[in-house]
Amino acid sequence: MELLNGTGLWPMAIFTVIFILLVDLMHRHQRWTSRYPPGPVPWPVLGNLLQVDPSNMPYSMYKLQHRYGDVFSLQMGWKPMVIVNRLKAVQEVLVTHGEDTADRPPVPIFKCLGVKPRSQGVVFASYGPEWREQRRFSVSTLRTFGMGKKSLEEWVTKEAGHLCDAFTAQNGRSINPKAMLNKALCNVIASLIFARRFEYEDPYLIRMLTLVEESLIEVSGFIPEVLNTFPALLRIPGLADKVFQGQKTFMAFLDNLLAENRTTWDPAQPPRNLTDAFLAEVEKAKGNPESSFNDENLRMVVVDLFTAGMVTTATTLTWALLLMILYPDVQRRVQQEIDEVIGQVRCPEMTDQAHMPYTNAVIHEVQRFGDIAPLNLPRITSCDIEVQDFVIPKGTTLIINLSSVLKDETVWEKPLRFHPEHFLDAQGNFVKHEAFMPFSAGRRACLGEPLARMELFLFFTCLLQHFSFSVPAGQPRPSTLGNFAISVAPLPYQLCAAVREQGH
């Protein structure tokens, strides 16, 4: 009765507070060692959750790095986290300790999206037999269907032609190029996965791109961070369905595409696309409970290819066109090199790249300056490791700050400016820096890097071969600030695409 009247609540409240504080102290035991990386003092229970800005994590990391050094720690709720900055420390983690830092930490929100131990795809999969099996399959199959070969190059070149037609149809009007670039890159991925192409005005394609964008927004930001930090909240009935509605709709959309592909798949015929090849492996794996080839994992592999393979390259090209309208002298110099090496009639080819050092330097500088993936996907240590004289215990989440490498003032002459000469020597030859790692490094480096490099060169040169891009008359100069949502995209901007006349 005293408890109900409130007189007995104080002892219970005091006990609860003491219990929570003891649990909190237990989760901070790493900080009790003298060689643990320094960092801001965490709040009880919340840790440093309120001391970082999820909407602009790169800037939060920048400020903390300048205060605590190249290797510093955070406590997100009760999850210990170490942020690794600058080239030397990043190389230690990704290369020297590559085997010990290749695993991914658990992501509780993914369980709500149907991710299971044997259906994690490739990008977010735990480091182990299933990941090796799927990465080996993905690399092998992408090569089978043309990655690094003339066949895929011809497909990309053909799609670049369709993209040029779409720009021409605008008749020099002021447009935001983002949608058209997304459609072009989506078609390249769709060709690999489904062996099909969508017209740019196809409602099906427009719907798919809308769902991709919505799903990426849903899994980034403050709410997902809170749910991953305190996964018990995911048990609230209906919460996950409401928070991740767009993600689940996107999954259902892909399920329909995969079902359509399955109805026309003939196991007796050579695979037409990646989906056919995966379905063939599913058939082989029947009765093997250890295999990662199953229908659920097919969906996750496709999600990986669309998000990692399409969005990143389209975003980089969006940065490229923005920088061309902001730096017209650079644009004209690229066009001059295109005219000298390729001309204005023949389609660009990958063999041209070796003879176009300035264009190659500009593409690399776009990737460096755009810095679209500033924070590498999280990893977790599988044993104690030593980095820069600090000891990082087993089970610590690692965040690799690639932005600190791409914009390191000790490496780059003008780290915060767009400066293609970063990749040219005194004689004008192309030079690649070891600090250039937009695709990460080590065992979990981007498996689609060869495809992305091909797409960037062919789309970029084809566009500048046919058009001159400029800021629309009467409009202010666009900003080079980015919008962070897993990747960093330019703020919305407008441009005009004027068809180049022969000989100009």
UniProtKB/Swiss-Prot annotation:
GO CC term (a single one): intracellular membrane-bounded organelle
PROSITE patterns on file: CYTOCHROME_P450
Enzyme Commission code: 1.14.14.1
UniProt keyword annotation of Ribonucleoprotein present: no
GO molecular function annotation: heme binding; iron ion binding; monooxygenase activity; oxidoreductase activity, acting on paired donors, with incorporation or reduction of molecular oxygen, reduced flavin or flavoprotein as one donor, and incorporation of one atom of oxygen
Gene for this chain: Cyp2d10
Root EC class: oxidoreductase
Reaction catalysed by this enzyme: an organic molecule + reduced [NADPH--hemoprotein reductase] + O2 = an alcohol + oxidized [NADPH--hemoprotein reductase] + H2O + H(+)
Natural source organism: Rattus norvegicus
Family designation: Belongs to the cytochrome P450 family.
Main location per the UniProt record: endoplasmic reticulum
Localization annotation: Endoplasmic reticulum membrane; Microsome membrane
PANTHER family: CYTOCHROME P450 508A4-RELATED, CYTOCHROME P450-RELATED
Induction: P450 can be induced to high levels in liver and other tissues by various foreign compounds, including drugs, pesticides, and carcinogens.
Name of the molecule in the record: Cytochrome P450 2D10
Membrane topology type: Peripheral membrane protein
Protein purpose: Cytochromes P450 are a group of heme-thiolate monooxygenases. In liver microsomes, this enzyme is involved in an NADPH-dependent electron transport pathway. It oxidizes a variety of structurally unrelated compounds, including steroids, fatty acids, and xenobiotics.
GO terms classed as biological process: arachidonate metabolic process; xenobiotic metabolic process
Residues given in the record as heme binding sites: C446
